Amino acid sequence: MRSIFKASIIFLCLLTHSLLLVGNNPEKKIDHILIISAYAESNPWSNSFITPIVTMASQDSTIGAYTIYLNMFALQNSREVDKFEENIAEKLPASPPKMVVFIGNASFVFCDNLNKIWPDIPMLLCGEREYTGPDSLIIQGHAIPPKLRIPISNLQKKMNLTMMYANLYIEENLQLMKRLIPQMNKVVYIGDATYMCQQNDFDLSEIIKEKHPELEYQFISAQTTSTDSLF
């Protein structure tokens, strides 16, 4: 009789424990937000967009956030971009994300294909320019000349896109520098071989050539210059 009583108590305890586990882990529908950043994980500008989203997700159990940082040097052709997109889809849950957030114009190369994988998915583009261009130029780290530029407004006609434009104010910064340093006669821009830096170099050199011909301009690339040589 005592053994039956003990067995009953153990069974009830196990049953209660199982019910508590079920109660503490209800199946919830989680809306995932996919964030793709063309910048490094430590970039302050990129994090100013990412941090609020991740914070919101941490405070709401029905929202999840996935952040992917691109290594643009590792993407050399469209085949590698396609493979990268396949890896994205494999890492995410079976259900499509609720929306995709792109940070940095270079990340826009994924818009078209991800829209094919998840038709009409809401996309938020946070970029420095209101245009994009041929994927091949961006992947290979070449600036997009004016004749090849595609306005984001054209993409909005066929995709569910919202553009958050973050103007670089190149001309305004040049004017401010001239006011603060009246004796300035040369502008040096230090960048690398990524599309973003190459586009900045192209635009900056064109503006100086057209509006400030009295200024000398030089682009120093990390690809060909060591940090020590700058000092």
Regions found by a protein language model. Give the residues of each.
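Bacterial N-terminal signal peptides
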Residues: S8-S18
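Short hydrophobic alpha-helices and adjacent helix-cap/hinge residues
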Residues: R2-I4, L21-F231
